[in-house]
């Protein structure tokens, strides 16, 4: 989870900075080309914070960066630096709402539906297998070599993967840069694309207009928090529900930690009790990341004692 920082200290995994930088068509092309391992040319400028809504009664979504290639393929790139347990189903919902906007009302041939990519870049491992990249396409269970050619692809990228030999060096460097967006890291890469992205990052951080937008967003978030606290004082039941949601999140994290550790062997009762008894949400988040990286239960136990 990324702490509150000044604009100059933000990493590219931060959603605000990511949207600002990827608003540049060339930078967006560079990022997509690195991720997909092929040269991508965009048809028009990307749209950041693009909203999709199918009805006033349905939940809308706001995509970080939406773009369309010259071939008509559509892309949504999302930066995720806050741990969430619903990203898999969220990607399904994003896919459905994005698809709903791609065909004109009178089009009857669904083969005209654009190919699409949902790309989520996270600074934690959603699946716990230490991969930099997880790519999902629909396949037939009864015949594993039979794909469902619906043109939909969902990719989850993990900045902390360990399978360097299975992905390109440029992708590894890009994901490392997403989480460590510094002059030093940019200077160590041999990728011209990453260096161009870094130039755009520095330009955004120096921009007075971007700085004003960032300050405004921070003020709006703070105002929302204050308003939420005031409303909570007025409505004790609301506060109770909020506490319930926080406890619910922590319970999910406790379960996720234990699931990851169970993959490494039998979890001792005393360690299970320690995890179940932890009440600090930030500590649980840190333990979850440690469990995802641990090579053994003993390794995890040693780390949390430090």
What are these regions (language model features)?
Residues 1-208:
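Conserved single-residue anchors adjacent to enzymatic active/cofactor-binding motifs
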Residues 2-8, 16, 68, 75-80, ...:
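Short, charged alpha-helical interaction segments and adjacent helix-coil junctions
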């Amino acid at each position: 989870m990324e702490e509150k920082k000044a604009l100059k200290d933000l990493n590219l995994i931060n959603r605000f900075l990511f949207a600002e930088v990827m608003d540049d068509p060339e930078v967006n092309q560079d990022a997509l080309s690195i991720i997909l391992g092929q040269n991508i040319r965009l048809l028009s400028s990307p749209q950041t914070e693009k909203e999709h809504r199918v009805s006033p009664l349905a939940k809308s979504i706001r995509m970080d960066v939406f773009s369309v290639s010259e071939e008509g393929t559509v892309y949504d790139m999302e930066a995720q630096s806050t741990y969430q347990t619903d990203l898999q189903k969220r990607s399904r919902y994003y896919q459905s709402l994005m698809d709903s906007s791609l065909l004109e009302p009178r089009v009857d041939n669904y083969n005209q539906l654009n190919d699409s990519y949902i790309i989520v870049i996270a600074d934690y491992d959603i699946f716990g297998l230490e991969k930099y990249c997880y790519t999902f396409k629909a396949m037939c269970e009864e015949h594993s070599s039979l794909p469902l050619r619906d043109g939909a692809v969902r990719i989850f990228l993990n900045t902390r993967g360990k399978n360097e030999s299975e992905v390109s060096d440029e992708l590894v460097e890009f994901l490392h840069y997403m989480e460590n967006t510094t002059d030093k890291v940019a200077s160590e890469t041999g990728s011209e694309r990453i260096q161009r992205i870094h130039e755009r990052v520095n330009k955004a951080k120096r921009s007075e207009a971007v700085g004003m937008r960032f300050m405004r967003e921070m003020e709006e978030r703070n105002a929302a928090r204050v308003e939420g606290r005031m409303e909570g004082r007025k409505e004790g039941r609301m506060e109770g529900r909020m506490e319930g949601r926080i406890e619910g999140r922590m319970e999910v994290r406790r379960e996720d930690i234990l699931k990851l550790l169970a993959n490494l062997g039998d979890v001792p009762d005393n360690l299970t009790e320690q995890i179940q008894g932890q009440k600090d949400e930030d500590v649980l988040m840190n333990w979850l990341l440690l469990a995802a990286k641990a090579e053994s239960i003993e390794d995890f136990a040693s780390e949390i004692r430090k």
